[in-house]
Regions:
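Membrane-spanning helices that line or support transport/gating and their immediate boundary helices
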Residues: 79-83, 87, 132-140, 144
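Transmembrane helix boundary and interhelical junction motifs in multipass membrane proteins
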Residues: 38-52, 56-79
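Short, membrane-exposed interhelical loops at transmembrane-helix boundaries
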Residues: 93-113
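Membrane interface segments of multi-pass transport proteins and intramembrane proteases
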Residues: 94, 138-155
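Small-residue-enriched transmembrane helix starts and helix-helix packing motifs
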Residues: 12-36
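Juxtamembrane non-transmembrane "cap" segments at the membrane-aqueous interface
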Residues: 75-100
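Residue-level signature of transmembrane alpha-helical entry/exit and packing/kink sites
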Residues: 21, 25-29, 59, 63, ...
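Transmembrane alpha-helical segments in integral membrane proteins
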Residues: 117-139
Length: 156
């Protein structure tokens, strides 16, 4: 099982580093593909990653690779949105609507607002960090990584 996942990782890394475009376009596509996972996309993440990368003039292949390779991160990123939003705006900060008959509705509206604010903050923060990391890796380590990959053997 682990060897199968390592082979998939190796394949996706090779595909990413062999893209014949400049580092900016590849890192932009990868970053936009990654940022889709902060938004609930209901199974459309890889498609939205590709379309988003193409729309913002990034590399759509890099967007698809990050959309497929990092789809398992969605539950953690969803929870991170709620945690960041709740840290910045704890319960009781948003004014409740007057005359609301249910306390549950108030809590649901608060949770939605907290999630949305956390999502916006996380997208901006992680967008800058991931773009910088991928750009640096593509500029400095692309060729050396591709020569190392030739020697990288994973047992079946």
């Amino acid at each position: 099982m682990i060897n199968k996942n390592l082979r998939k990782l190796k394949f996706l890394l090779i595909k990413l580093f062999r893209i014949k475009e400049n580092a900016h376009n590849v890192s932009l596509g990868f970053t936009l593909g990654f940022l889709i996972h902060f938004i609930p996309s209901f199974g459309m993440g890889p498609i939205l990653s590709t379309v988003g990368a193409k729309l913002f003039k990034g590399n759509p292949i890099a967007g698809f690779i990050s959309g497929v390779a990092l789809i398992w991160l969605f539950p953690f990123l969803f929870y991170l949105n709620v945690v960041v939003g709740e840290t910045l705006f704890p319960y009781g900060v948003f004014p409740s609507a007057t005359g609301m008959p249910s306390h549950g509705l108030d809590a649901g509206i608060h949770l939605g607002a907290v999630f949305f604010i956390g999502m916006i903050i996380n997208i901006m923060l992680f967008g800058m960090v991931v773009y910088y990391l991928i750009y640096t890796i593509m500029r400095k380590y692309r060729l050396s990584f591709l020569t190392i990959v030739k020697k990288w053997e994973i047992k079946k």
